[in-house]
């Protein structure tokens, strides 16, 4: 049965468990769920591995409340912490944990965030232009949209949305502001629609998707945070520990690919008569994997997922 796009079904759950299983089959494994969200992946992992302890991190306080309730039956085996995932080493240390056997990142916007009309993540719902994962800090998308210059808006939309009509969209935003602030998601979506040629609008899904992605990424500093988090997470893995990352757009996937490639390669140039030192990490996915055809059919959010995994080897 096909589910609604905003219904919470963990993406790539079976593949995630399969990739993490060898690392979690030790006597007392620890895993960090760096983006615990509503706790779907963590719940399944705690059920599958009775000795597992999970430290779950999220910047979204609303999600943490729901995850805490969902995971209450596991008692002390599940610890939920409000933090950014580039702080996961500090979070682990605060819990008395120096290394972990598994780490999971499920990046992007959760189904709950899309479903909450006051968050501003969904271009199909009337809502204030917020887009902050943590609404207690930082500037909202509305503040950015209504105060930044044409050049700044163009850069954000082009760099984080990979939108070729970035300059046209920024110009129309500036023009719309003359009549008053752009305050709602539907107003922004309409501005984007009017900025893109009709022929282009007829292909590739909703034309506002890339612009909304751009402002969400910028407001939450997602790329910079992820760029810091992945190397930190790799160092936190125990020998034979494994990390799985689920990403949903090319900007995220490129960061993960680059970090994984760097640590899984030797530093000796090819062709030199030198015995290379073995790499400290081994790729478990040669390239990024997608969801199965069946999962994409029943869970719309899985359609864009890219899965990468890596294992720490003996030094």
Where are these regions (language model features)?
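S-adenosyl-L-methionine-dependent methyltransferase catalytic core, i.e., the SAM/SAH-binding region
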Residues: 1-315
């Amino acid at each position: 049965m096909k589910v609604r796009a905003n219904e919470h079904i963990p993406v790539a759950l079976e593949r995630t468990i399969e990739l993490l299983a060898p690392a979690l089959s030790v006597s007392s494994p620890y895993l960090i769920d760096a983006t615990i969200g509503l706790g779907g992946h963590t719940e399944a992992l705690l059920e599958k591995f009775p000795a597992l302890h999970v430290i779950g991190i999220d910047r979204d306080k609303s999600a943490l409340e729901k995850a805490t309730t969902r995971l209450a039956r596991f008692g002390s085996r599940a610890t939920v912490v409000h933090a950014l995932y580039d702080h996961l080493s500090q979070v682990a240390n605060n819990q008395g944990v120096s290394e972990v056997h598994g780490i999971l990142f499920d990046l992007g916007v959760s189904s709950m965030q899309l479903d909450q009309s006051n968050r501003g993540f969904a271009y199909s719902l009337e809502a204030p232009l917020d887009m902050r994962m943590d609404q207690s800090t930082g500037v909202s998308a509305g503040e950015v949209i209504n105060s930044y210059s044409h050049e700044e808006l163009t850069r954000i939309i082009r760099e984080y949305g990979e939108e070729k009509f970035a300059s046209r969209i920024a110009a129309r935003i500036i023009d719309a502001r003359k009549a008053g602030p752009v305050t709602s998601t539907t107003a922004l979506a309409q501005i984007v629609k009017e900025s893109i040629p009709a022929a282009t609008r007829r292909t590739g899904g909703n034309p506002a998707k890339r612009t909304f992605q751009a402002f969400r990424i910028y407001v939450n500093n997602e790329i910079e945070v992820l760029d810091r988090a992945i190397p930190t997470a790799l160092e936190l893995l125990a020998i034979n520990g494994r990390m799985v990352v689920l990403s949903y757009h090319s900007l995220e996937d490129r960061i993960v690919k680059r970090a994984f490639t760097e640590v899984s390669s030797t530093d000796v140039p090819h062709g030199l008569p030198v015995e290379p030192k073995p790499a400290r990490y081994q790729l478990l996915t040669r390239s990024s994997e997608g969801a199965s055809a069946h999962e994409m059919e029943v869970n719309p959010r899985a359609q864009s997922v890219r899965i990468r995994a890596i294992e720490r080897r003996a030094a």
